[in-house]
Amino acid sequence: MESRIIEIDPNCVNEFEKLKKKYKIESIFLKLNDNFNLLYVEKTLSKISQDDFLESIPVDQPRLIIYKKYSNNKIIFIRWIPEIVQDTIEYSYSNASTAILELLIGINEYMEVKDLIQLSNL
């Protein structure tokens, strides 16, 4: 499969820098556009419970999520790819995660997740 070039919206890095500097942001949801060539910030969340965080994750659509765990001050990069996602879409998100991780300095942990149960102990 041919590798696609993924463009990263600058707001992805800007929001990450805010999260690192202890602004009110606790998580950043990144999504690819319909052409799978642009990664952008879908939404940011702050001051929410873990249950609300888990409920905000789409059960049938992939996302790249940056989550700040304030209890130990770790920043976790989560590649959420539900089991039902087509291989071509999973491949696009894999390329996007590689591209964005090159720009994000300060990620402490990386998780590949296919089942929300894996996130229940964040």
UniProtKB/Swiss-Prot annotation:
It is found in: Cytoplasm, Cytoskeleton. Residues 3-122 form the ADF-H domain. It comes from the Eukaryota. GO terms for molecular function: actin filament binding. The keyword Cytoplasm applies. Keywords: Actin-binding, Cytoplasm, Cytoskeleton. GO terms for cellular component: actin cytoskeleton; cytoplasm. InterPro entries: ADF-H (IPR002108), ADF-H/Gelsolin-like_dom_sf (IPR029006). Pfam families: Cofilin_ADF (PF00241). One of its GO terms (biological process) is actin filament depolymerization. Signal peptide: none annotated. Controls actin polymerization and depolymerization. Belongs to the actin-binding proteins ADF family. This is Cofilin-5. The lineage of its organism: Eukaryota, Amoebozoa, Evosea, Eumycetozoa, Dictyostelia. The gene is cofF.
